[in-house]
Amino acid sequence: YVFSILLLVKKDALTGLLNRQAYYSETSRAYKDITAIVSIDMNGLKKINDTYGHQAGDEALITLALCFKRSCNVRQSAYRMGGDEFAIVCYKNTEEEVLKLIERINEHVGKTNYTCSIGYCFQKDGRIELDELLKVSDEKMYQNKAEYYKTNQ
């Protein structure tokens, strides 16, 4: 019973992914094993919500979450950080494994009607603070998002 309640607290109700609270809880415990964070932001969610309604936006988020789940291996965990923002934490991955993860994400998302912008930060020695990993990953994702909107207006 207690396990069920803990699981509910750590899961995002809409997508079934782990939530922001789980992200902070789990990453603080396993920090030394984290080699990369991948930041993902859905492109065009506001337009979907405004054009087709929030139910369509929710369906888009659920679809993308499934793409992220399918892309992860056992040493990669997907989280919904809030809104249309997601993160994947990679434990004891090489940079090549992280790039293959991003390739799988792009492949799965490419089969949908949606797009997303992705950035990542990799470290092999555990010297970068977790907040800095996420900050750099987010910055790269926002650079990619700006490029996307520059070419898709």
Describe each PLM feature range.
Residues Y1-L6, E107:
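Regulatory sensory/coupling modules that transmit signals to nucleotide-handling catalytic cores
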Residues L99-N106, G110, F122-Q153:
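Catalytic-core segments of nucleotide cyclases and related cyclic-nucleotide turnover enzymes
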Residues S77-R80:
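A short pre-motif secondary-structure segment
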